[in-house]
């Protein structure tokens, strides 16, 4: 089975083109566990399957290293857009990608036939507790206390098609990240678990972020997480609506025009291609 390794700011993925490769859908979760293993597999933060779609140019399904399926991934969708365009599978600089969170529309900045930057319409944020989903009374979750592991965190909950728990801190380096991340991810308040973002506000136009991804652990970047962080920053009065998000391996630029969709801009890179032993 042929695959391509790609990343968006170090958030890395294995892409399998199911237009060409025959893969049994029942095998998707197990393949993700095996292929994403960094010691015994290819190594990645997720396995991305490209499939035909009746309503878009392509359908994208993404599975975490633990075999669970994610609704959406902003860094992965940029990698998918680059893959499709540079192989001539799409001709336009706007692509429709079907995900479990809906149809997303990446726009490509192309120079000399190469995709240099991808801007993605990530849709509208969902803010009601039931839409996250999160246990508790109706309404938004803004700066609400959440107790776990003997500590209390002030959280803001945002869904970008997948759940995010955003926490603003004074000093990102002082956060007990490896302890707090998994405790919050699996907290009973989140019936489908959650992604966790710790945010340090530098200025209203700049923030630093560390992310603990549901089903993957700490990753170097998270596109939907960066979007959720800026939405939370606006709602709490910490940031403006055009924000640069500093991540471990680089920056994403997030825009949230008032009352409208969230837009994410960032790079995507291919690393290598290879063959993985698989039989249907």
Swiss-Prot record:
Protein's pathway: Amino-acid biosynthesis; L-lysine biosynthesis via DAP pathway; DL-2,6-diaminopimelate from LL-2,6-diaminopimelate: step 1/1
Top-rank lineage group of the source organism: Bacteria
Active site annotation, chain numbering: 73, 222
InterPro entries with a match to the protein in the record: DAP_epimerase_AS (IPR018510), DAP_epimerase_DapF (IPR001653)
Subunit record text: Homodimer.
GO cellular component, one term: cytosol
One of the record's GO molecular function terms: diaminopimelate epimerase activity
Gene assigned in the entry: dapF
Residues with site note (Could be important to modulate the pK values of the two catalytic cysteine residues): 164, 213
Functional description taken from the UniProt entry: Catalyzes the stereoinversion of LL-2,6-diaminopimelate (L,L-DAP) to meso-diaminopimelate (meso-DAP), a precursor of L-lysine and an essential component of the bacterial peptidoglycan.
Subcellular locations according to the entry: Cytoplasm
Entry EC number(s): 5.1.1.7
Entry keyword set: Amino-acid biosynthesis, Cytoplasm, Isomerase, Lysine biosynthesis
Protein name, UniProt field: Diaminopimelate epimerase
Keyword Cell membrane: no
Alphabetical list of Gene3D superfamilies matching this protein: Diaminopimelate Epimerase, Chain A, domain 1
GO biological-process terms attached to the record: lysine biosynthetic process via diaminopimelate
Positions bound to substrate: 11, 64, 74-75, 162, 195, 213-214, 223-224
Swiss-Prot/TrEMBL catalytic activity: (2S,6S)-2,6-diaminopimelate = meso-2,6-diaminopimelate
